[in-house]
Design a protein with these regions (language model features):
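Major-groove DNA-recognition helix of helix-turn-helix-type DNA-binding domains
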Residues: 50-51
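Thiol-based oxidoreductase modules, predominantly thioredoxin-like and allied folds used
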Residues: 25-47
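Thiol/disulfide oxidoreductase modules built on the thioredoxin-like
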Residues: 54-61
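Local sequence-structure signature of Cys/Sec-based thiol-disulfide redox active-site neighborhoods
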Residues: 1-31
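A short, hydrophobic beta-strand/beta-hairpin element that forms part of a small beta-sheet core
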Residues: 61-72
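Catalytic Cys-His active-site segments of thiol-dependent hydrolases/isopeptidases
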Residues: 75
Length: 75
């Protein structure tokens, strides 16, 4: 299953969330819904080099995808 970290106020997240709606291969995790979700995302963002460029330019790094093999991608 592909995990997708999103937030409703992010326009890019809204777009991709609609694209995967109803697809059982995706688990959509809203980081604004519960502090546990936010903590999972922060841990990922703080420890994964996939976020280095996003952090350099001041982006949050969502939407973010964690593929089945553990690969993290922002695209």
């Amino acid at each position: 299953m592909i995990k997708m970290f999103v937030m409703p106020t992010c326009p890019y997240c809204d777009y991709v969330e609609k694209q995967v709606e109803g697809n059982p291969r995706f688990e959509v995790i809203d980081i604004s819904k519960h502090v546990h979700n936010l903590q999972m995302f922060i841990d990922l963002r703080d420890n994964n080099p996939a976020f280095d460029e996003a952090k350099k330019i001041g982006d949050i790094g969502i939407p973010c995808y964690v593929l089945e093999d553990g690969t993290v991608t922002l695209s």
